[in-house]
Amino acid sequence: GHPKKRFFTFLTTAVFLLIGLLLFCVISSGEGKIKIYFYSTETNINNFKSLKMEFDRYLSKFGPYEFQPFSSRDVFEKQVKGKENCLLLLSSWHYSNIHQKYALTPALTGLRNGKKYQKRIVVTSRKSADIVAGKPGLVASASSLQYTNSALNSMFQGKYTHPFKVLTVPKDIDALMSVGFGMAKMAFASESAFDELKLINPRLSSKMKVMAEGEETLGLILALPQGFKGNSQQTIHMIKNMSMDADGKRRIRMLGLDSWQELDAADRLKLES
């Protein structure tokens, strides 16, 4: 029975070695992946599953990329802390807040309707009496609470002593509709969304007025950590060219963008000042 026993020992060892090798391959292939972490303070994107699936399918054509969307700023920041083999997709407001702490460099910015800079506005109903000083009432917004409050405070410069009550909605257009249908007192949205509403529903938009305007800001930013190990030029190039083919264009539409553009010195200065 010795040869048989020896054969079984050999077989068991071989099987274990194979399992070990497979595990090693699986783990190391996971390690070699370049993650693209996405979190936007400006949109309330809730179709994460399809977003991840669509982006992974598209990016896999170019190499070991993996798309990871987040719905929470805290979780996103914990995840990217200390990571070098990743790219970050985040709003310009968020980038300005964390770029020093996380040693980030901006590479591209997203264009919406062909425009690099967007303006945020506060819209209210034309017939609503001037909002009582101190009590702003309900604000509809598709942006994160932190970003909404920060932007409103700088727009109104401390005019309201009470904090803003925010009604979170999926999209900017929903925020505007909320005011149109009397569900909220004010809407915090992009100027481009209001222009869109004027086209879709001129009657509803004519009942609304712009109450405050913010400064022009860049949209979504693609940023790299300073110690990025991959081929940064190749990676940036791949993202930048997404709008060149129908597949890529469809994916960036899911982020509310129509193309990417490189940042110039003036953009960087504004972003990092």
What is each of the regions a protein language model found here?
Residues G1-F8:
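N-terminal secretory signal peptides that target proteins for export/translocation
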Residues G32-K33, F38-Y58, Y117-L176, F181, ...:
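Bilobed "Venus flytrap"/periplasmic-binding protein-like clamshell domains
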Residues K33-T41, R112-V122, P202-S243, K249-E272:
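Periplasmic-binding protein-like
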Residues F67-Q79, K165-M177, E216-L218:
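Short helix-initiation/N-cap motifs at beta->coil->alpha
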Residues L89-Y102, G180-F181, K185-S206:
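A ligand-binding cleft/hinge motif common to bilobed small-molecule-binding domains
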